[in-house]
């Protein structure tokens, strides 16, 4: 696995964990929610910008993206 891919995976796991903690979800629930409402795709597509933000800002961005795609958590 290349270093870039490894960094992206580590970052995504960290973001899913932070999202889960923020909303009181399990990791599995958080991943399913983010995957269903395009949060995972957003993290992958916007990695270069998002990984430079604080985790609080990233969780907020994920919440907005998922809400725009039908998610209920705000």
Features from the language model and the residues they span:
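C-terminal alpha-helical interaction appendages
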Residues: 1-74
């Amino acid at each position: 696995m290349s270093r870039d891919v490894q960094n992206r995976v580590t970052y995504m796991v960290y973001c899913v964990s932070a999202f889960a903690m923020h909303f009181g979800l399990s990791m599995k629930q958080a991943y399913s929610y983010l995957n269903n409402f395009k949060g995972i795709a957003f993290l992958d597509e916007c990695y270069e910008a998002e990984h430079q933000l604080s985790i609080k800002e990233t969780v907020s961005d994920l919440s907005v993206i998922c809400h725009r795609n039908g998610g209920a958590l705000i």
